[in-house]
Amino acid sequence: MGRAMHDFDILVVGGGHAGVEAACAAARMGVRTALVSFDPARIGAMSCNPAIGGLGKGHLVREVDAFDGVIARAADAAAIHYRMLNRSKGSAVWGPRVQADRKLFHAAVQAIVATQENLTVVPGEVAALRFEGARVTGIELADGTALSGQAVILCTGTFLGGKLYRGEEIMVGGRIGEDSASRLAEQMYGLELPMARLKTGTPPRLDGRTIDWAALEEQPSDGEDWTLSALTPARSNPEIFCGITRTNARAHDIIRANLNRSPLFSGAIDAQGPRYCPSIEDKIHRFGDRDGHQVFLEPEGLDTHLVYPNGISTSLPVDVQLGMLRAMDGLFHVELVEPGYAVEYDHIEPRALTSGLRLKDVEGLYCAGQINGTTGYEEAAAQGLIAGLNAACVVLDREAPALDRATSYMAVMVDDLTLHGVSEPYRMLTARAEYRLRLRANNATARLTPLAIELGCVGGERAEWFARREEKRARLDAALDSQASAKQMQDLGLPVKSDSGKMALREWLRFPTIDFPDLAPLVPEVDTGTELAAELAEDAAYAPYLARQDAELRELKANEAITLAADFPFAEVPGLSSEMVERLTAARPETLAAAGRVPGVTPAALAAVLVHTRKRGRAAA
């Protein structure tokens, strides 16, 4: 390795979803970036389920895409099954989800990484972080190679101190067949960083040729034309169906009879697993009254017989896994290709991080993905993007992107993590966002791409596409300002009262019985059937509700503008109880708005902090 490979601006450790987004985001910003991976050939591999998106998660994917990220483009290149979840509810909580061909997804990520300017892939195990005082200055590889950088982003996934469990078997590793980052984990514990352990798991992989598909309920792809990335012109792959079966009393009996052989119940694993993706043994133990649990049989690709049984993550012994599977309809003769297993791993206490995902007490050290206590590809990708952008802004001496709970699900997630911490793997849900009417999956581009362009992390193709989109948006906006009378509505066959008067088309769209395409004869100069037209129509429909939030948002913005120093002396605030001092000192919120979201902090305490910040400001002036 020549000296040119030794010196970088940013070093990203780990080639999973967080690492890829962090490295590519930093490189798009123009800084020299190294992506360090155990095995570069595995960069972009899907460790668990072959799917991208879902409830809350689809919002994150679209937001990462708005910054010209990788995950949505790769998912579209690999998509073989599409579902828009929550379609029966309002569009604010719709969840776009695609099932991906693993090989195609991996190939798409590899191609994007290989062609990304300013990005160098470095093979090797990171053995240690290098420091000067309290600042990280680089990393050392297991072979002794030293790489220097102004920032290091740890995206270690489940590899940091990873252990794999299957029945009585215990193996060292972060993923089956791959080693764990044990030396780096030892160093981080030695640095007395706030660390803990969490657990996740994966189901067995099945041989699809041994499944009786005719005995299963079919779940077809949705047949529409939406995609995850705004830059994807159309769906490109054949679409397949998934099968649905259920666990049953016989399968439950097999599981119950062998709970003592599960590491979750034998005491081998004491780390907490994900609440919203429990193992099948956990489901049977906690929900013993249920007569069955759905299992979605998802083909892993177009040219493979592997099938992913979504819903039965397990670490039971192999013989028990096979027995419970063969008790289910359609699986009486199924064969296992790879048994399921659980993985326990180290993570950072996320309250030790800033809103830019930098460790508060270590300059230049960032963390993203499962190392921060989250679960899921989409959560990891979003954190990788945020860490990469913030680290690049420090290198370039630019202001970091201003994201808050009213502008993105990404900021909701980071705010939840850094203020509340985790006691179990965190996953994104639409219910976590109090401003979700503003944060629809289909308006991520409008919300975030202008900021992305301002930051300089958007490529030429997306910038040109966005400029054309804005021209179309302006024409649609002008059309929505057109006036129409109740009689004109009735002439179109729309059920409105004669005394409704004359209104702008955007106001007529607030009527639940009127859709934008219904108004096409009134505005022939625009296409009312596009995704962009639907987005603007939804903006119009939600406008009265959003207006009611405006005062609340103004207060949020004002409080976000009041910053609190990392060493803010809460103990010196007059009238602040010892409990409030303890809570605020532990959380170390960066703004007054963040202080208000610390659990247990009262409005009175917040007012006292505000008064004290103003006094400090006057004294310093």
UniProtKB/Swiss-Prot annotation:
Q: Where does NAD(+) bind?
A: 273-287
> What Gene Ontology cellular component terms go with this record?
cytosol
Concerning InterPro entries, the annotation shows: FAD/NAD-bd_sf, GIDA_C_N, MnmG, MnmG-rel, MnmG-rel_CS, MnmG_C, MnmG_C_subdom, MnmG_C_subdom_sf
The cofactor(s) it depends on are:
FAD
Q: Which domain of life is it from?
A: Bacteria
Instruction: Give GO terms for biological process.
Output: tRNA methylation; tRNA wobble uridine modification
Select a single GO molecular function from the record's annotations and give it. flavin adenine dinucleotide binding
**PROSITE patterns, from UniProt?**
GIDA_1, GIDA_2
Subcellular compartments = Cytoplasm
Keyword presence, Coiled coil? no
Presence of keyword Transcription: no
Keywords from UniProt, A to Z, are:
Cytoplasm, FAD, Flavoprotein, NAD, tRNA processing
Residues at which FAD binds: G14, G15, G16, H17, A18, G19
Report any Pfam family annotated for this entry: GIDA
Q: What does this protein do?
A: NAD-binding protein involved in the addition of a carboxymethylaminomethyl (cmnm) group at the wobble position (U34) of certain tRNAs, forming tRNA-cmnm(5)s(2)U34.
Q: Which PANTHER family match?
A: GLUCOSE INHIBITED DIVISION PROTEIN A, PROTEIN MTO1 HOMOLOG, MITOCHONDRIAL
Which NCBIfam families does this entry report, sorted A to Z? mnmG_gidA
Q: How does it assemble?
A: Homodimer. Heterotetramer of two MnmE and two MnmG subunits.
Protein's name in the database? tRNA uridine 5-carboxymethylaminomethyl modification enzyme MnmG
